[in-house]
Regions:
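Membrane-proximal basic amphipathic "stem/tether" segments
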Residues: 1-74
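Conserved phosphate-coordination/catalytic loops
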Residues: 74-81, 145-146, 169-170, 223-226
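SAM cofactor-binding core of SAM-dependent methyltransferases
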Residues: 78-146
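Generic enzyme active-site microenvironment
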Residues: 97, 118, 166, 190-191
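Generic detector of well-ordered alpha-helical packing
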Residues: 100, 121, 169, 193-194
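Surface-exposed interaction regions that form or flank ligand-binding interfaces
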Residues: 143-156
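A short acidic, Gly/Pro-enriched loop at the edge of an enzyme's catalytic core
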Residues: 154-164
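C-terminal substrate-binding/active-site "lid" region of AdoMet-derived donor-dependent transferases
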Residues: 164, 170-241
Length: 241
């Protein structure tokens, strides 16, 4: 009931106040070329206002569908909207991706990149994602409560080095501790929901290892909340940060 009311109000604002809404959404959905990617009055003068407004209307469509969608109606990760669009414009076909936690993001990366290896602990999600039978997407079911750490150490089961390692599942700090050795020299680590205090040990560890961070705080895709997605990178990284 509340969600539907909010959708109606947002839709009304869209049709009745396009000029003011462009300014608001330009703050919420800034251009990926602005590395700060946060609210700023200066962004109001950004020439990419129409692009920001387009992204905002896409966000409204995602909320209506209750899943994150791109402009073509295809699934996208449930990251912060700013991070989602940033990735959409910078991913390359030759990239290899590893995910701790499968989902709509797995389908998105499979469309954009060379290969995706995803670890999942939930049987239902595992069956849902594997049912798509995508050739360049491999999903593996791992025991979350194993004494041997089967889930967080699963990345060592594979010989590959990865351009992107996405930490968006369970035991995120432990996953972060394990993933550096499997990252290419120009690789990037993505931590979703990075605003949560419980992930501070993992973030501090990466900073101690010489990684810089790019935080993207914006509305969450398909949700009426704000969230943060952080990219941990080094000089000369594959996303051009």
């Amino acid at each position: 009931m509340v969600r539907n009311l909010l959708k109606f109000c947002l839709g009304l604002l869209y049709f009745r106040g396009r000029g003011k809404m462009r300014n608001f959404f330009c703050d919420c959905f800034p251009s990926p070329d602005n590395k700060l990617l946060k609210f700023s009055s200066g962004i109001r003068n950004n020439p990419n206002k129409d692009d920001a407004f387009k992204k905002a209307t896409q966000w409204l469509s995602s909320m209506s569908a209750d899943i994150s969608l791109d402009s073509n109606g295809l699934s996208m990760p449930s990251y912060s909207v700013a991070a989602m669009h940033f990735l959409d414009e910078r991913l390359k076909k030759e990239m290899k991706v590893f995910e701790f936690g499968s989902g709509l993001s797995s389908l998105f990366y499979a469309r954009k990149c060379k290969s995706v290896t995803s670890i999942e602990h939930n049987q239902e999600w595992f069956e849902k994602i594997t049912s798509h039978e995508i050739k360049n997407l491999a999903v593996f079911l791992k025991n979350l409560n194993s004494e041997n750490g089967d889930y967080e150490k699963a990345i060592f089961d594979f010989d590959e080095q990865y351009d992107l390692i996405v930490v968006d599942g369970r035991n995120r700090n432990k996953c972060i501790f394990n993933c550096i050795k499997k990252l290419t020299k120009n690789g990037v680590i993505i931590l979703d929901d990075s605003h949560r205090d419980k992930y501070l040990p993992g973030k501090q560890f990466l900073e101690e290892q010489g990684f810089k961070s790019l935080k993207m705080f914006s509305p969450a895709s398909s949700k009426l909340t704000f969230t943060e997605t952080t990219f941990f990178y080094r000089t000369g990284n594959c996303l051009g940060i």
